[in-house]
């Protein structure tokens, strides 16, 4: 035994490899550290196999049985109890420093030997517990998930768990679970949940917070349950099945009182929305994002045009509409530039442009490629910027004369130093964005100027109030509205209107100059008109002050002079916006059909006061003025008036089969308004050349007007009295959209919808006519007229013989016949008798539906009986 111990390799030699038989012997020579001192084992321990065996047992049991190896067993047991405290101080793994350096760690606490020697921070990381990759563990997890799903179904029997899991917002899920679990505790059955739901929680009543876990650590992290009104609990319908979609088992678990509380308004505390006449909200929460990643879940009022647009285009009754067409029409993000491009503008200021998302209604024939470095250099050139500024004042300034041309060019040419350089660059980039878009340039250029304008909106700028900043904000609002971003436009118009009222733009300042008065009037009424238009389009409460708090007059115009004025458009729009704002403030969406008709009669005189050019002389006179902006100025107010009325009356389209005569009159009135608008837009696009601005307005109002005949076409039959009117409107809208689609991708998309619906109308009309045709006359058992023709014809041997069994029984009018047939009824001859030569020609078989001798007799002798 001693020879084997002496021949064993040394413990300090790390390069040598220990054999398995020698490992146990050398294990007794391990150096142990106690209180920072090394203790060397006696030689007897290394040579005596009894001590070696005791050391192995100590390593396995965690006791130090070798320290008193020469004593008896009773003394050894006592020492083991005393040394348990020392062994507990040894960590389960090496410290972080030893693991990083690949050192052998003593695993002592608080500091190991190596860290103490080299003066290092000794830190022991928690041991990582890895999931076992076994079938048993996977089965256990599957069973646990199934139990959790069943537990959630018992807690929330009317919720769709799959849709709940799709929610990515963890905080929002906690809120929904908190609202849904009010007055519930784990383990309750479905009937107990029903009883708790039957007792609605009054708003402001304190409720105890319930936790889904008994662990105090988990309870401390849980969100407390806040008192929630029952209306908010009822509004979480996107995570629930509707009652019609619930299966029989779930319907049995829900009591009748629960459904009555969830889908009715029986409690006064929870009926605030119904008291004010508002429609119930059908979403659990709203969220929108109109940047690179589009999220369209914003709130639109039930009577708004955007709500109706989404509902109608997502309906299965409209042909050619996919599930995402409504979103594509409202938001069209096609081009993304992921490069950060510098843009050098006036005053030698370089600004970095953030990532750009291009949204445009530019031509679908033009390629929309991302911006390159050459494009950024081109857009920063003095010539390019000057061209876009000229385009702005040529096209957009005629509609909204907001910018003082003299002051703007004085600052642009460095003749006047701007008061705030950042605000000046916001205004300059806003002008460039609209000018670039109006000039039919590459669709991705204007987005660079827009993003550059936003980059200057710093905290210092938002803490400043000035007229120039207000002008820049309203121009940015118009820009994002043209890019089909209604939510961003709504946010900007709110900021703009609040800044305008803080500057007192809604009040008249008699001591100011005429130029300043005109500028303040135009700016305020532009903000007012834009806010009213967005409020009507989205169905949201207006942010504008009451008319009683506004005393600033309308802009002055040369109305007595026959020359056109750039203030005509804003004056007409302001007058109409005042009428609409007064209507919206009276909760117009909840007025009856009779009240709406009475209100329409009161504004009929105003609509007649601003007619649109319709005669050929008036249309020609607009072209002779050689003012590109004048046709749009003349037509756009007319379109706006009618689309506003359509939006107000669209709330009555929810009833498919109304019984109230006033509701029927309101729907027919919408059809008349849409007819005027559609034919007016069609006249405009056929008579005048248009740019991006006029194309956008024509498409914008044509889409909203064409929704009315689309609604009627999906709900009436060809025998209806309005069928021909609907058909004519769809055809005219289709022709106008075809012209606009050359410059607008949005028009091209909607034109596809109109084309498919018009084809479906022709198909329905053809099928209906074939069904209404009288049954064919029974064939007689005599010789048919076709047989006689074969005998009378000079080419009798070449003419085919048609038997009675081969004769068609009826004629079906198909779409191809309706679209391509140009054959008219043959007028009678001068003598009153039919042409004999044509009569004897075999080709005249097509004149008869049947070939009986009665028809031949009636045809020859002109007998109508």
From Swiss-Prot:
Record-listed Zn(2+) 1 binding positions: 95, 98, 105, 112
Keyword Zinc attached: yes
InterPro entries to which the protein is assigned, alphabetical: bZIP_sf, Fungal_SecMet_Regulators, Gal4_dimer_dom, Transcription_factor_dom_fun, Zn2-C6_fun-type_DNA-bd_sf, Zn2Cys6_DnaBD
Ranges for region Disordered: 1-87, 818-840
GO CC annotation terms, alphabetical: nucleus
Residue stretches of biased makeup (Low complexity): 67-85
Pfam families according to UniProt: Fungal_trans (PF04082), Gal4_dimer (PF03902), Zn_clus (PF00172)
Positions that bind Zn(2+) 2: 95, 112, 115, 122
Keyword Transcription: yes
Residue ranges of the annotated DNA-binding region, renumbered to this chain: 95-122
Record Gene3D superfamilies: 1.20.5.170, Zn(2)-C6 fungal-type DNA-binding domain
Swiss-Prot/TrEMBL keywords: Activator, Carbohydrate metabolism, DNA-binding, Galactose metabolism, Metal-binding, Nucleus, Transcription, Transcription regulation, Zinc
Subcellular location: Nucleus
Biased composition (Basic and acidic residues): 22-34
GO molecular function, one term: zinc ion binding
GO BP annotation list: DNA-templated transcription; galactose metabolic process; positive regulation of transcription from RNA polymerase II promoter by galactose
Biased composition regions of type Polar residues, renumbered to the chain: 1-15
Top-level division of the source organism's lineage: Eukaryota
UniProt xrefs under PANTHER family: REGULATORY PROTEIN GAL4
Function: Positive regulatory protein, that controls induction of the lactose-galactose regulation of Kluyveromyces lactis.
Name of the molecule in the record: Lactose regulatory protein LAC9
Lineage, opening ranks: Eukaryota, Fungi, Dikarya, Ascomycota, Saccharomycotina
Name of the gene encoding the protein in the UniProt record: LAC9
């Amino acid at each position: 035994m001693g020879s084997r111990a002496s021949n064993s390799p040394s413990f300090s030699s790390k390069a040598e490899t220990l054999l398995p038989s020698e490992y146990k012997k050398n294990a007794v020579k391990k150096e142990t550290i106690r209180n920072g001192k090394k203790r060397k084992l006696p030689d007897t321990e290394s040579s005596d196999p009894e001590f070696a065996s005791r050391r192995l047992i100590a390593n396995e049991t965690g006791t130090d049985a070798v320290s008193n190896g020469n004593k008896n067993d009773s003394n050894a047991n006592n020492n083991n109890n005393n040394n348990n405290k020392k062994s507990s101080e040894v960590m389960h793994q090496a410290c972080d420093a030893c693991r990083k350096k690949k050192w052998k760690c003593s695993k002592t606490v608080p500091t190991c030997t190596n860290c103490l020697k080299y003066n290092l921070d000794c830190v022991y990381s928690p041991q990582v517990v890895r999931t076992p990759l076994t079938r048993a563990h996977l089965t256990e997890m599957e069973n646990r998930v199934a139990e959790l799903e069943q537990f959630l179904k018992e807690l929330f029997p009317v919720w769709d768990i799959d849709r709940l899991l799709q929610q990515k917002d963890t905080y929002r899920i906690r809120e929904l679970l908190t609202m849904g679990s009010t007055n519930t505790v784990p383990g309750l059955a479905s009937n107990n949940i029903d009883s708790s739901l039957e007792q609605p929680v009054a708003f402001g009543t304190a409720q105890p917070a319930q936790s889904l876990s008994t662990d105090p650590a988990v309870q401390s992290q849980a969100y407390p349950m806040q008192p929630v009104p029952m209306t908010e609990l009822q509004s979480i319908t996107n995570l629930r099945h509707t009652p019609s979609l619930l299966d029989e088992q779930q319907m049995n678990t829900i009591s009748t009182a629960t459904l009555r509380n969830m889908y009715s308004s029986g409690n006064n505390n929870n009926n605030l929305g119904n008291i004010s006449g508002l429609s119930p909200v059908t979403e659990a929460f709203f969220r929108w994002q109109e940047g690179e990643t589009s999220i369209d879940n914003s709130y639109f009022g039930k009577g708004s045009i955007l709500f109706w647009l989404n509902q109608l285009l997502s309906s299965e009754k409209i042909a050619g509409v996919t599930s995402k067409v409504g979103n594509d029409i409202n938001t069209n993000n096609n081009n993304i530039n992921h490069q950060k491009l510098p843009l050098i503008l006036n005053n030698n200021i370089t600004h970095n442009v953030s990532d750009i998302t291009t949204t445009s209604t530019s031509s679908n024939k033009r390629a929309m490629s991302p911006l390159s470095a050459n494009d950024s250099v081109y857009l920063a050139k003095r010539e390019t910027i000057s061209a876009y500024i000229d385009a702005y004042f040529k096209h957009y300034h005629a509609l909204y004369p907001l910018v003082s041309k003299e002051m703007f060019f004085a600052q642009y040419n460095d003749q006047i130093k701007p008061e705030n350089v950042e605000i000046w660059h916001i205004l300059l980039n806003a002008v460039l964005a609209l000018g670039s878009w109006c000039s039919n340039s590459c669709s991705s250029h204007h987005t660079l100027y827009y993003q550059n304008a936003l980059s200057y909106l710093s905290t210092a700028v938002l803490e400043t109030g000035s007229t120039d900043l207000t002008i820049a904000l309203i121009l940015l609002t118009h820009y994002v509205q043209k890019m089909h971003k209604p939510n961003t436009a709504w946010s900007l118009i709110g900021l703009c209107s609040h800044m305008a009222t803080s500057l007192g733009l809604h009040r008249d300042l008699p001591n100011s100059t005429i130029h300043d008065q005109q500028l303040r009037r135009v700016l305020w009424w532009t903000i007012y008109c834009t806010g009213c238009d967005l409020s009507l389009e989205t169905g949201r409460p207006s942010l504008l002050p009451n008319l009683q708090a506004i005393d600033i007059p309308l802009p002055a115009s040369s109305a007595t002079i026959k020359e056109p004025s750039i203030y005509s458009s804003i004056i007409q729009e302001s007058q109409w916006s005042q009428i609409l704002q007064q209507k919206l403030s009276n909760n117009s969406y909840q007025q009856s059909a009779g009240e709406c008709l009475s209100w329409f009669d009161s504004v009929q005189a105003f609509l007649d006061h601003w007619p649109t050019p319709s005669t050929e002389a008036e249309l020609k006179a607009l072209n002779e003025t050689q003012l590109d902006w004048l046709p749009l100025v003349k037509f756009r107010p007319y379109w706006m008036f009618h689309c506003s009325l359509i939006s107000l009356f669209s709330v009555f389209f929810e009833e498919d089969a109304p019984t109230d005569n006033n509701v029927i009159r309101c729907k027919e009135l919408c059809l008349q308004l849409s007819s005027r608008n559609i034919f007016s837009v069609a006249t405009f696009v056929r008579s005048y050349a248009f740019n991006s601005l006029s194309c956008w307005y024509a498409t914008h109002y044509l889409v909203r007007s064409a929704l009315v005949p689309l609604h009627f076409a999906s709900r009436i039959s060809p025998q209806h009295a309005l069928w021909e009117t609907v058909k004519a409107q769809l055809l005219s809208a289709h022709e106008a959209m075809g012209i606009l689609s050359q410059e607008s991708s949005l028009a091209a998309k909607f034109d596809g919808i109109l084309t498919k619906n018009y084809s479906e109308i022709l198909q329905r009309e053809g099928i209906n006519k074939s069904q209404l045709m009288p049954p064919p006359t029974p064939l007689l058992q005599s010789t048919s007229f076709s047989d006689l023709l074969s005998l009378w014809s000079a080419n009798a041997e070449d003419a085919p013989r048609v038997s009675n069994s081969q004769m068609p029984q009826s004629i079906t009018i198909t779409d191809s016949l309706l679209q391509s047939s140009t054959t008219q009824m043959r007028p009678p001859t001068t003598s009153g008798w039919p042409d004999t030569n044509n009569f004897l020609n075999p080709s005249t078989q097509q004149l008869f539906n049947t070939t009986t001798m009665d028809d031949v007799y009636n045809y020859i002798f002109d007998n109508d009986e």
